[in-house]
Regions:
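Intrinsic-disorder/low-complexity, polar/charged segments enriched in Ser/Thr/Lys/Arg/Asp/Glu/Gln
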Residues: 1-3, 41-45
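A short, amphipathic beta-strand motif
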Residues: 2-10
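Short Pro-Gly-centered beta-turn/loop motif in secreted/extracellular proteins
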Residues: 45-54
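Beta-strand-rich extracellular modules
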Residues: 58-60
């Protein structure tokens, strides 16, 4: 499972209602994961495996690299 926590850069407060989507790279494991919206804690959970890819928040690149566990991104 991969979880993403979205926080505001300035305050560190959670971002509620942000759309988070994932795009994985790789010939076999590549592809996109449908977006989900963060809860009141700024968290969203995907029942998927780990791998190299990009986390998008509201359509903007928030992190590129290996995605696993609980990823914290700032917007």
């Amino acid at each position: 499972m991969v979880s993403v926590k979205v926080l505001y850069k300035g305050s560190g407060n959670p971002v509620k209602g942000a759309k988070v989507s994932l795009m994985f790279s790789g010939l076999i494991s590549g592809g996109s994961v449908p977006g989900k919206y963060t809860d009141y804690n700024g968290e969203v959970h995907f029942n998927i495996g780990t791998g190299n890819g990009t986390i998008y928040v509201n359509g903007l690149d928030a992190k590129t690299g290996y995605i696993s566990g609980m990823e914290v991104v700032h917007v």
